[in-house]
Every structure is written in structure tokens, then in C-alpha cells.
Design a protein with these regions (language model features):
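Class I SAM-dependent methyltransferase "Motif I" SAM/SAH-binding loop
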Residues: 49-53
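Conserved SAM-binding loop of SAM-dependent methyltransferases across substrates and taxa
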Residues: 54-63
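Nucleic-acid modification enzymes, centered on SAM-dependent nucleic-acid methyltransferases
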Residues: 1-46, 62-329, 345-377, 391, ...
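Charged low-complexity interaction tracts in eukaryotic proteins
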Residues: 471-474, 513-542
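Short glycine-dipeptide loop
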Residues: 41, 361-362, 394, 399-405
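A short glycine-rich, Lys/Arg-flanked "PGG" loop and its adjoining helix->strand segment in the class I
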Residues: 385-401, 426
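A short acidic, leucine-rich amphipathic alpha-helix
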Residues: 497-506
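Conserved beta-strand signature within the Rossmann-like core of class I S-adenosyl-L-methionine
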Residues: 365-369, 403-410
């Protein structure tokens, strides 16, 4: 067992990991450190909540055999795209033909008049909407070579956006799952996330992609299509940096934002030209595919079952499935690195419905391990606890004796923390290491919210033989908690952010078998300590 590289910082998402958006991606370089520490080349590494495939990709890159399982079909699609080689020349050739044919067709949906040369066929690149009305148009003009001009949307521009002349080929009619936490109201559909013009452009593009003969290249182009969907939607917010003009605060020029978590459609939002979204995403995917061709061994075989994986020296097996019933023989896995759903933080299937519906993927809603606020689903704390315990039971079963499993987790919920820890310890694992795991990038919410979780914790456990089940309980001593908080802040005179304090107390208390309630920590901080400039300090509130 090697030492972790304590001073290594999380690297940003680039190359392979910048090809497609997915939530809760972990820093690939730090995941690689854990794989190198707790496994050896040739070992089988399992991630039964594999998401976008960081664990699987890094395991294969490091000479391990890998198993990636996820209940979300688009997650497995993304993972496969992060592993599969492609002929770059053929891919570029197919894209060039696609561009030659489809860009003019799609751009016809975005024709506007150039104010400089009066060309009626200038191309709209961006439209700013206020609620249901286009207000501002950004365009380029091939005739006078204007690269970017901005004008107020005319009635003709509004009609082009609201009543596209081309026929809608096919678009998903899928109804989104009602859930206020992810901004979905009852009766909302996937199609509500796009303008009518964008739906037409996307439908034309997808219809043409489906006609590509080479199946691998078709898959990459569909991957590019789903990767482009967020920026082609109405969920791209407008950034306006405020400044003073004539002594008054004025909203600045508009800048392009991005899709944040959930299906929030801002009152002021962008509509971006569909082809522009697709081509920009293709450039990212091309860079990622070049890297895959370089770092993923050509000898790594894509296997269709465990038996095949067990016979090869290098390979991977990825499949859509549930973590509660692994089709893996007992004691055959060398290391596990998993990032299970953190209670109610991220309803993955609900958030992926936009992608899955365009790809016509069906989802197994019943067996998802999650707590959801949706009134349409029976996904409460009890269901989460039972399924999580079953998933850890399967991890314990397939893991080799005295081998290790690392679990990434964090939550502001007391019950969710207790469910996670007791699912783990109750299975028979012994906790041997707890370390914070920084994120590669922080969201707007993480940067601004007082109680934002800015890291996760990696809890590494060892499979005990003989099996010894334990349980964790809550420590209810308020005086002891206040003393520990005071001691921590004495040693941090510059103050500390909420997540730093939570990390310190959880890391120190979990191995003792008794943890403080997260809610009690937060309440005690509010009652007994001062919060200033984003940090808690020792000075009393009086």
C-alpha cells in the first residue's frame, strides 16, 4: 500500500474529462492516486456507481482491469466514450461532410438582416430572451465579414425564433419528473427546455447523425450531440457584470453563462445557434479522443461479462445495472473506489432525463439509490438506507479478503451520514483512513452559500476477516462539541470556512464510533461563534 500524494492539487477537467458534462466528477489525478495506493497492475478495480467513468478510465490507464456499473444509461454511454479508440482521420472526414450538408440547413433557421450591409442572410449566433420573447440578437455576416454585431430583435427575428419554417422531425415528448429541488414543475416536458427553433435544428441534426454508417463514428457524433444539448437549451443564463455609469449602477454587457444543476430556465436566457453548439462541442471531443488514443492501451479489451474480463490481461467491463446485485463472483475484486449518491444532493436519473430521452434510453427508476423530493417517487430516507446497505453488502462480497474500498461522500443531513456509515460498518468493513477530497471546480452555489460543501471525504475501509459488524451513533454532548469547536478555531486564528470545520470534526470523530450531528455543529457555530467575510472565528457573538 503506497502513500497518497498529500500535496497534490486537483487538476481541472480537460481532454477526456472535458468532453461531456456530468455531475460530481472527481479530480482524475486524485482518483488515480487512490488506485495506485490501494491496488496493483492487473488487479480488478470496481466502481459500482461509476457515473462518467473517472475510476474506470484511470484504472485502465494505470494497467488495471476495470468494472464500471451504473444505473444511469447515459453514464455508461459517457464512460464508454471515455475509453473507446477512434480513427481521428475518419471522424474528422465524417464531421466535415456533416458540416457541409447540415450547417447551411440549420443556419437557415437563424437568418437575420445585417445592419451594416443589409444582407438578409446574416447568421444569428445568439439570441437573448426575456421570458418568452426574443429581445437581443448577436449575429455574424458572411457578406461584409462582420464577425459579431448586436441589435435589438425585430418582429421578423421574433417570428423566425417562434415559428420556424422547417418541420420538426422528431423530439422527445418525455415528461420531466416533478421536483422543486431541480426546478421542475408538474407537467413540464423535455421539449420545454428548448425554443421551437432549437428543437427543429436539433431534430434535423440528430436525424442526419442516425444515417451515419460507421457505428463507432455515429456513437461519437451522438455523444457530441448530447454534449451540446445544455448550451443549446434555454438554461444558459445571461451574465451581466454591473458597473457605474454617470454615477449610477448599470447592468453591463451580456456574457454567456452555462447550464447549472437542475432544470432552471432563467427569465433572461440565451438561445445559441444549434450548429454553433454542436461544432464547439466537437472540438472538445476531438481533443478528448486524441488523448484516449494516446493514454488508453490498445490492448485493453472491452469485455461483455466478468468471465471474459477474468481471462484477459488488460480490459474493462462496463454495463448499465444496479449496485445492489453485482454479477461478479465473490472475492474476485482487488480494489473498489465508489462515489455513491449523497442522499438528496443529486437525483441523477431525473437530471439525466434530458440526455436519456434524446438518446431514447429507458431508465430503471425503481432501483435508483437516492433520496428524491419528487412527489411522483417513493424515494425516502428508508428506501435509500436499505438500498445503500445492500450495495455495500455486494461490495464486501466481491472484494478480496483484506482488500480495500474507498467511498467518496459528504452531506449536510444527519440521517444520510448515519445511513452511509452504518451501511459501511454494518457490512463488516473497518475504516482505516479518512481524507478530504477537493473538487476540480466549484459551482456558483459552492462559492457563495454559507453552508456550502466545498470538498468531499474519502472514507477508505478494509474488508475484515472474520466479519465484524459495527455501528456508529450520534454524540449528544453540546458542551464537548462547543469545546472542540473552540479548540479548532484557537488553532486557526485566521478563521475557517464551514466545510473546513465539518471536515475536521467528521475526520476526527468517525473512527471513534461516535459522530456529532452536522445540524448540531451548524447550530452551535451560529449560536456561539462569529461569522465574518466567509469565515467562522473565535470572537464571541456578543
Amino acid at each position: 500500500m503506497k502513500d497518497l500524494k498529500d500535496d497534490e492539487l486537483p487538476k481541472t477537467y480537460k481532454g477526456i474529462y472535458a468532453m461531456h458534462k456530468y455531475w460530481s466528477k472527481k479530480p482524475y489525478n486524485l482518483v488515480a492516486d487512490y488506485i495506485e495506493r490501494f491496488s496493483s497492475p492487473g488487479d480488478i478495480v470496481l466502481d459500482s456507481f461509476c457515473g462518467s467513468g473517472v475510476t474506470v478510465v484511470e484504472s485502465v490507464r494505470l494497467g488495471r482491469r476495470a468494472i464500471g456499473i451504473d444505473i444511469n444509461p447515459v453514464a455508461i454511454f459517457i464512460t464508454r466514450m471515455g475509453l473507446s479508440h477512434i480513427d481521428i482521420r475518419d471522424l474528422r472526414y465524417t464531421f466535415a461532410n456533416l458540416k457541409m450538408e447540415m450547417q447551411p440547413i440549420i443556419d437557415q433557421l437563424y437568418h437575420t438582416e445585417c445592419l451594416n450591409c443589409r444582407n438578409p442572410n446574416a447568421i444569428v449566433t445568439h439570441t437573448i430572451w426575456e421570458e418568452d420573447n426574443p429581445k437581443e440578437v448577436w449575429y455574424r455576416c458572411p457578406r461584409c465579414r462582420t464577425r459579431k454585431a448586436i441589435k435589438e430583435a425585430s418582429q421578423k427575428d421574433a417570428k423566425a425564433a417562434l415559428e420556424p419554417t422547417n418541420t420538426l422531425q422528431w423530439a422527445p415528448l418525455t415528461q420531466l419528473v416533478e421536483n422543486s429541488r431541480v426546478n421542475v414543475k408538474a407537467g413540464m416536458h423535455v421539449s420545454d427546455l428548448f425554443t421551437k427553433r432549437a428543437l427543429v435544428g436539433l431534430s434535423l441534426l440528430l436525424e442526419r447523425i442516425e444515417q451515419v454508417q460507421d457505428q463507432e463514428i455515429k456513437s461519437v457524433l451522438k455523444f457530441c450531440f448530447t454534449g451540446a444539448l445544455p448550451q443549446a437549451s434555454n438554461m444558459v443564463f445571461v451574465i451581466r457584470r454591473r458597473g457605474k455609469q454617470g454615477g449610477e449602477q448599470k447592468a453591463g454587457k451580456a456574457e454567456v453563462g452555462s447550464w447549472v444543476i437542475g432544470y432552471w430556465v432563467p427569465s433572461e436566457h440565451f438561445e445559441i445557434n444549434v450548429w454553433r453548439c454542436f461544432e464547439n462541442r466537437f472540438k472538445r471531443i476531438l481533443r478528448g479522443k486524441r488523448e484516449i488514443n494516446q493514454v488508453i492501451p490498445t490492448s485493453a479489451i472491452q469485455c461483455s461479462n466478468f468471465e471474459q474480463l477474468d481471462q484477459v490481461e488488460q480490459g474493462y467491463w462496463i454495463k448499465t445495472g444496479t449496485a445492489t446485485s453485482l454479477k461478479i463472483p465473490s472475492g474476485t475484486v482487488g480494489y473498489v473506489f465508489v462515489d455513491p449518491p449523497h442522499g438528496n444532493r443529486m437525483p441523477y436519473l431525473e437530471l439525466s432525463l434530458m440526455w436519456n430521452s434524446w438518446l431514447r434510453f429507458e431508465s430503471n427508476w425503481e432501483e435508483e439509490i437516492v433520496i428524491s423530493a419528487s412527489p411522483e417517487r417513493q424515494k425516502d430516507e428508508e428506501d435509500y438506507r436499505k438500498r445503500l446497505a445492500a450495495a455495500f453488502g455486494e461490495i464486501w462480497r466481491v472484494l478480496g479478503d483484506n482488500r480495500y474500498a474507498s467511498i467518496v461522500f459528504n452531506s449536510l443531513s444527519d440521517d444520510t451520514w448515519l445511513s452511509l456509515l452504518n451501511s459501511c460498518l454494518g457490512t463488516g468493513f473497518e475504516i482505516v483512513d479518512i481524507q478530504p477530497l477537493d473538487y476540480s471546480a466549484h459551482s456558483v452555489i459552492q462559492d457563495t452559500r454559507k453552508q456550502a460543501l466545498k470538498t468531499d471525504l474519502v472514507i477508505t475501509c478494509q474488508k475484515q476477516i472474520p466479519k465484524q459488524a459495527r455501528r456508529i451513533r450520534f454524540n449528544g454532548s453540546e458542551l464537548e462539541l462547543e469545546r472542540k469547536l473552540s479548540d479548532y478555531l484557537v488553532h486557526h486564528p485566521e478563521g475557517a470556512e464551514t466545510y473546513q470545520i465539518l471536515n475536521a470534526l467528521l475526520v476526527s470523530s468517525i473512527p471513534t464510533g461516535s459522530i456529532y450531528r452536522v445540524s448540531s455543529i451548524l447550530d452551535t457555530l451560529e449560536d456561539k461563534f462569529k461569522f465574518a467575510q466567509g469565515r467562522w472565528c473565535l470572537e464571541s457573538k456578543g
